[in-house]
């Protein structure tokens, strides 16, 4: 042994734990220690330090040995391996004063050694280790023994400390099996070679500890042994769940351990550990716990012991006492496991007492944010219970139904209190994470109310609306209590979407209180936000009772003056909902509506989504105006209002102006979308439409569209970068093109075509190609799309640098996807155009489309594949020979690409598309396709070397049939070498 290396390692350990090193020096020292561990002297360093009297040296020695075991065990001889086992066992058995830190690390090292040894040497070591630790008989490690002989001679243990050491070792062994790096190596070998041989002995040890040491907890080692046994129970549960094996088939004796664990729950010294253990067991193995044990646990939880712990759970969280929610875990775990029994026996005292405990947990003090876990975790149980009960047979039993409703209604009442917002000052003091957490919890409480509505119905409306009426009549409540009643109503209105006389009557009572106006008087932002949500939820009611609109919308517009984005967004969504639902009732208010919008626009240009909602809202109202000239006059006012904001001098810098510009364009896009015609029949005959259609000849339409084009041109010229605005401009144009009948935003086809051609060459953007596709599919103006127009559009595309350069073509995925979509439409609408006017370009994009098949970019592959299908199937009776020549030219490379995909070069998701293309080729020319398939599959090793020529011959026969999906799947699996894997044997299809 090199004494210098040992001394150097000892100094490094001393320096590392001395607390005198800087962070950089600590990193350097750790690096030096790792180098020493990896060296040839690492084994000697570990063994030498393990015998030291210094705690940190002992710990480092065990750590070094564990590292060497995990990475370099093969460097030890069989004799050295046995000696290493003995030395680790000696450390545990002969050193009574071993510090807990060192003891745990030595046990971890021993567990790692056991697993590695049994995997590589295929010899049992865990049985011997358990026997030596339990019986304190080190000399028996070299003896021949099996599971039967160990069981016959194992009991009793030498001492409670030996029992504790054994349980600690079992726990670490199971943890290593579950989480160590070796689980990836061979999970089946770990289960069969390590766990299974000693599993019954493990259970026997645990049964002995639970049975004997729970009787006398005055001894510290007895308590320690019980705690380790409980840790083992959690570890076994975790490992069996991870290994996906049945307790009943693999470890039936584990049931006895679970039963005995219940006895520990009432033992103060190990109660919390036992509760956590049982919560874990109930989550995974509740069906294996015997009924007598379940009854015993039920009695404990609902008896004096449970009541005491419930009171502890409900203590003030600011009292300074730690609470790890062990009682909550066990109660929730037990209640979830017993859910069917609770429902079936809801009238029994034990069920009622358990449910009242769970209801009480919703009264946990404090706000339900991240730090408050009690109410949060209880909520999910109640939501599930209410839903399950409402669908059970018990709900049809009047006595059971009445008992359950009494308990559940108390939960609903507690939910109201739990939803209460804090004061504005406290709310603003919370970090955003806490506010988000609270809002998330409120949404979960809303789910509870929705579930409760299925059993309570009108009773919930009565409770919340009566509470609101009393609030306004008494005048003594807080804004928070009013807000939470609004919120609860929102929740159940989302659930109850059906109109009914009962609902109508209750909402009439609600609106008769003028709640919106009275709520706005508090000037409480959160109250106004929830009030706006409630108005939105009542949109269908307001559609049938428009008299309440004039006292609702003004409140919402006033709320937009609150300079808080989240509130503005909520309010704008509510305005949008009311305007889309009740537009026809708001025509008389249009002038006031417009005035408010004009006033708010300068303040809202900084919040694009809000401004868009407001503009599209007024757009929906104007769309209901039958007089086209009057309608256009309001649209002109909106456009002029937007134009007034586009003055750079109004803003501190150009960057802010650029954002305002985009906000304004987004708002105009919202107006454009709002102008969708609502009539069932178009005002023009789509089939007979001509350039002379009177719609565009109306002076008001022509004037508005001239103004719109001027606005778009002006916006382009003022943008710092065209790329920032092109998407919004195209969105405005597309909104007009997508209508069944033209709207004021439906620019003439020739205008949009000219815009496309002028812009695409210098700025090839995907959204421009989307515009091109919209032009081709527009239901009117198609007579304007003559060959010259198509030539102009295709020439703009052909001359684009992005299209010419193959690398750019492949890298700009969004452009390429839209390009193939555009050309697919041309093939459908104008079948012979591409081959006649652009034969070389057509061949180019076809070849590139073939190359894209099998690519991982799914959207790109799909677009290219659909283009190929459109090309093959397009009808070209006037150019049949030319089309046949084109298809024949691509047939061979296309089939080769398809076969490569079938042969494993494409992902599973590509197989349906490739199969579809092959089907179209067969339909177009079966004999030519068969010849290409035959020639390709005769090539040696093509498309994969994993399949024989005989398999390929059978596959060729299969491909020539009508139904090929199953055969393609089988061939793909064989080529990928997956036939023996679970994935290959699974039942997936396409």
Curated annotation (Swiss-Prot):
It is found in: Nucleus. GO terms for cellular component: cytoplasm; cytosol; nuclear envelope; nuclear periphery; nucleus. Keywords: Nucleus, Transport. One of its GO terms (molecular function) is nuclear import signal receptor activity. One of its GO terms (biological process) is protein import into nucleus. Disulfide bonds: none annotated. It holds the Pfam family Importin_rep_3. The keyword Nucleotide-binding does not apply. SUPFAM superfamilies: ARM repeat (SSF48371). Belongs to the importin beta family. Functions as a component of the nuclear pore complex (NPC). NPC components, collectively referred to as nucleoporins (NUPs), can play the role of both NPC structural components and of docking or interaction partners for transiently associated nuclear transport factors. Active directional transport is assured by both, a Phe-Gly (FG) repeat affinity gradient for these transport factors across the NPC and a transport cofactor concentration gradient across the nuclear envelope. This is Importin beta-like protein kap111. It comes from Schizosaccharomyces pombe (strain 972 / ATCC 24843) (Fission yeast).
């Amino acid at each position: 042994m090199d004494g210098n290396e040992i001394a150097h390692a000892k100094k490094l350990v001393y320096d590392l734990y001395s607390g005198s090193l800087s962070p950089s020096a600590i990193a350097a020292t750790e690096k030096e220690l790792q180098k020493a561990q990896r060296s040839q002297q690492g084994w000697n360093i570990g063994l030498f330090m393990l015998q030291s009297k210094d705690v940190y040296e002992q710990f480092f020695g065990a750590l070094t040995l564990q590292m060497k075991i995990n990475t370099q065990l093969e460097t030890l001889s069989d004799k050295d391996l046995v000696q290493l086992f003995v030395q680790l066992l000696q450390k545990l058995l002969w050193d009574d004063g071993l510090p807990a830190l060192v003891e745990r690390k030595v046990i971890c090292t021993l567990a790692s050694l056991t697993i590695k040894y049994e995997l590589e040497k295929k010899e049992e070591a865990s049985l011997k280790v358990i026997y030596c630790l339990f019986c304190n008989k080190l000399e028996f490690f070299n003896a021949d023994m099996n599971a039967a002989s160990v069981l016959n001679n194992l009991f009793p243990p030498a001492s409670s400390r030996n029992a504790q050491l054994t349980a600690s070792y079992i726990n670490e062994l199971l943890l290593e099996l579950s989480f160590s790096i070796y689980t990836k190596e061979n999970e089946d070998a770990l289960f069969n070679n390590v766990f299974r041989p000693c599993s019954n002995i493990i259970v026997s040890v645990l049964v002995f500890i639970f049975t004997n040491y729970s009787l006398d907890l005055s001894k510290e080692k007895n308590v320690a042994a019980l705690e380790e046994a409980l840790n083992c129970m959690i570890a076994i549960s975790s490992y069996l769940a991870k290994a996906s094996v049945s307790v009943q088939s693999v470890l039936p004796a584990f049931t006895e351990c679970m039963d005995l664990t219940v006895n520990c729950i009432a033992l103060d010294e190990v109660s919390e550990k036992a509760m956590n253990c049982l919560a874990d067991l109930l989550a995974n193995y509740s069906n294996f716990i015997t009924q007598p044990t379940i009854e015993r646990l039920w009695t404990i939880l609902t008896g004096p012991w449970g009541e005491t712990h419930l009171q502890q759970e409900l203590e003030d969280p600011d009292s300074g006492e730690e609470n790890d929610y062990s009682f909550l875990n066990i109660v929730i775990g037990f209640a979830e496991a017993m859910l069917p029994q609770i429902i079936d026996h809801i009238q029994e005292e034990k069920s009622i007492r358990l449910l009242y405990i769970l209801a009480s947990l919703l009264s946990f003090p404090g706000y339900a944010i991240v730090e408050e876990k009690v109410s949060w975790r209880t909520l999910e149980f109640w939501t599930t219970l209410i839903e399950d009960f409402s669908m059970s047979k018990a709900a049809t039993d009047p006595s059971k139904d009445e008992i359950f409703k009494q308990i559940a209604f108390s939960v609903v009442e507690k939910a109201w209190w739990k939803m209460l917002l804090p004061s504005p000052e406290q709310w603003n003091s919370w970090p955003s994470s806490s506010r988000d957490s609270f809002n998330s919890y409120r949404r979960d409480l809303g789910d509870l109310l929705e579930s409760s509505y299925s059993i309570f119905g009108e009773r919930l409306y009565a409770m919340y609306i009566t509470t609101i009426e009393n609030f306004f009549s008494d005048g003594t409540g807080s804004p928070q209590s009013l807000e939470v009643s609004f919120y609860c109503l929102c929740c159940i209105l989302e659930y109850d979407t059906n109109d009914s006389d009962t609902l109508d009557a209750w909402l009439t009572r609600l609106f008769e209180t003028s709640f919106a106006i009275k709520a706005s008087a508090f000037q409480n932002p959160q109250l106004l936000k929830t009030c706006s949500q409630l108005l939105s939820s009542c949109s269908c009611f307001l559609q049938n009772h428009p008299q309440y609109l004039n006292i609702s919308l003004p409140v919402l517009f006033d709320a937009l003056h609150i300079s808080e984005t989240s509130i503005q967004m909520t309010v704008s969504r509510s305005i949008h909902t009311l305007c889309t639902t009740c537009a026809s009732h708001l025509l008389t208010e249009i002038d006031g509506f417009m005035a408010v919008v004009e006033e708010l626009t300068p303040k809202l240009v900084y919040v694009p989504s809000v401004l868009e909602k407001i503009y599209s809202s007024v757009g929906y109202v104007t769309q209901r105006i039958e007089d086209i000239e009057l309608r256009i006059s309001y649209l002109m006012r909106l456009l002029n209002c937007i134009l007034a904001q586009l003055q750079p001098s109004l803003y501190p810098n150009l960057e802010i102006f650029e954002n305002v510009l985009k906000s304004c364009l987004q708002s105009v896009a919202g107006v454009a979308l709002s102008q969708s015609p609502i009539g069932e029949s178009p005002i023009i005959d789509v089939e007979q439409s001509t350039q002379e259609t009177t719609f565009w000849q109306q002076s008001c339409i022509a004037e508005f569209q001239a103004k719109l084009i001027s606005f778009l041109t002006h916006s382009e010229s003022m943008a710092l970068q065209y790329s920032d605005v092109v998407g919004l401009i195209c969105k405005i144009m597309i909104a007009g093109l997508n209508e069944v009948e033209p709207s004021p935003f439906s620019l003439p086809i020739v205008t949009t075509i000219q815009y496309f051609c002028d812009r695409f060459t210098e700025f090839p953007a995907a959204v421009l190609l989307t515009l091109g596709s919209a032009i081709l599919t527009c239901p009117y103006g198609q007579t304007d799309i003559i060959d010259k127009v198509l030539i102009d559009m295709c020439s703009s595309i052909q001359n684009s640098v992005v299209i010419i350069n193959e690398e750019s073509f492949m890298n700009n995925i969004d452009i390429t996807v839209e390009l193939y979509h555009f050309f697919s439409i041309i093939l459908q609408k104008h079948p012979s155009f591409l081959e006649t006017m652009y034969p070389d370009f057509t061949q180019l994009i076809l070849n590139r489309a073939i190359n894209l098949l099998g690519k991982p970019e799914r959207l790109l592959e799909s677009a290219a594949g659909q283009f190929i299908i459109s090309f093959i199937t397009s009808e070209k009776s006037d150019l049949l020979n030319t089309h046949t020549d084109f298809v024949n030219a691509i047939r061979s490379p296309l089939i080769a690409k398809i076969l490569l995909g079938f042969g494993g070069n494409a992902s599973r998701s590509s197989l349906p598309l490739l199969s579809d293309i092959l089907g179209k080729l067969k339909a177009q020319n079966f004999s030519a396709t068969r010849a290409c398939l035959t020639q390709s599959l005769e090539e040696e090793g093509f498309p994969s070397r994993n399949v024989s020529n005989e398999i390929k011959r059978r596959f060729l026969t299969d491909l020539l049939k009508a139904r090929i999906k199953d055969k393609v799947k089988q061939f793909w699996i064989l080529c990928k070498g997956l036939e023996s894997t679970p994935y290959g044997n699974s039942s997936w299809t396409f």
